[in-house]
């Protein structure tokens, strides 16, 4: 039976597919870490209290990148170049979701509008990350090789999502509510399309590595398209709702270390 668990187990059991999976994940996390590090450095003076939380957000993502690279090293594997069509983070930036890298490379302070854009973009992408890690935690939290990494990253992603909810609600109370809802909607509708395209590309690469028969590849592609249809018809709304999280001030302290993955 084809299931999320059996699919990931197949990827996990093969060195080349595991190598590609970890390389894609590490690259995306490292890119997110750089983006958040730059945002933290450029936070406007009126929002300087937010800078340590943005920095913590970036530090967590840097840590996740190191964890995925450490998982490769543990199996004696080297990272591979990430195929362009599988680079989720880069494709989001290319399609104008979040803050442009050219803007972040400059030393010009961001505006409050920029910070709202960053938080709204993160609200959408962290929803996806939290859901994906929850799925892995459900099936692989006790796995001897990746279980600890899965639990740690999953907890961090839940913290990131809680942080986005709390800060966006703060900005909404300050009068930015309509702007937040507009950016959330635009980001969510773009994200579900990019997620579909990246998922199809990743499965195509995995299928060639693992020698999947055409029927299996077609079934997986049909499943990805079905998820997109569901999300386009209304599933995207889960990515734009805001509620006060149970985890308050989720990024209020320093990033947790992962010395065992150093």
PLM features: what roles do these ranges have?
Residues 1-262:
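Non-heme di-metal
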């Amino acid at each position: 039976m084809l299931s999320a668990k059996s699919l990931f187990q197949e990827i996990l059991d093969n060195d080349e597919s595991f190598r590609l999976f970890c390389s894609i994940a590490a690259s995306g996390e490292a890119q997110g870490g750089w983006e958040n590090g730059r945002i933290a450095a450029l936070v406007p003076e009126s929002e300087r209290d937010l800078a340590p939380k943005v920095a913590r957000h970036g530090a967590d993502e840097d840590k996740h990148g190191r964890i995925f690279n450490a998982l490769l090293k543990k199996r004696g594997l080297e990272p591979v170049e990430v195929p362009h069509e599988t680079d989720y983070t880069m494709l989001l930036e290319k399609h104008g979701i979040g803050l442009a890298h050219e803007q972040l490379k400059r030393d010009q302070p961001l505006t409050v509008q920029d910070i709202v854009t960053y938080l709204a973009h993160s609200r959408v992408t962290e929803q996806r990350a939290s859901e994906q890690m929850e799925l892995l935690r459900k099936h692989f939290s006790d796995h001897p090789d990746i279980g600890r990494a899965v639990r740690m990253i999953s907890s961090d992603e839940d913290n990131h999502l809680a942080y986005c909810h709390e800060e966006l609600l703060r900005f909404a109370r300050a009068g930015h509510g309509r702007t937040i809802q507009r950016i959330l909607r635009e980001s969510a509708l773009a994200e579900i399309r990019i997620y579909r395209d990246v998922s199809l590309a990743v499965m195509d690469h995995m299928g060639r590595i693992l020698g999947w028969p055409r029927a299996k590849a077609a079934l997986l592609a049909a499943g990805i398209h079905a998820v997109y249809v569901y999300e386009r018809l209304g599933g995207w709304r889960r990515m734009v709702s805001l509620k006060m999280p149970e985890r308050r001030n989720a990024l209020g302290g320093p990033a947790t270390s992962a010395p065992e993955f150093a």
